[in-house]
């Protein structure tokens, strides 16, 4: 399945997940499903095309080569470390193995958004 093979309903589901991730984390999330001819280099090039790439996260999935790449901008990488990305990839692979592309992307995006969420700050001066 290439990007053009996604149904409108699937596109909306992915878009909703990306919007929710932005609300949760304050970071811009993007997803790409399609060929990555140069592997990770292609994913990095696609990430660079995102407005505000330094604060953005791209999940790139190449179904034909069965690869998943997560590219984080320099600012996004502060909150989303390699371990978080590996966990998200593991979650996505699990869904993909069950033939659930959209669920996999949604799981990965939500996991990354939760890791990027700013921690709640409790002040000592606030009443309990």
Segments (PLM) and residue ranges:
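A structural boundary signal for the start of the first folded domain, especially the loop/turn
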Residues: 1-56, 63-128
């Amino acid at each position: 399945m290439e990007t053009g093979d996604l149904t409108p309903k699937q596109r909306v589901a992915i878009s909703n997940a990306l919007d929710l991730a932005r609300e949760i984390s304050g970071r811009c999330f993007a997803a790409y499903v399609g060929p990555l001819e140069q592997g990770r280099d292609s994913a990095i090039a696609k990430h660079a095309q995102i407005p505000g790439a330094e604060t953005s996260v791209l999940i790139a999935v190449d179904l034909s080569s069965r690869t998943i790449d997560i590219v984080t901008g320099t600012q996004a990488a502060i909150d989303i470390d390699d371990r978080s990305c590996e966990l998200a990839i593991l979650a996505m692979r699990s869904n993909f193995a069950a033939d659930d592309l959209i669920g996999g992307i949604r799981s990965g995006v939500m996991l990354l958004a939760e890791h990027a969420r700013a921690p709640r700050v409790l002040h000592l001066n606030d009443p309990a």
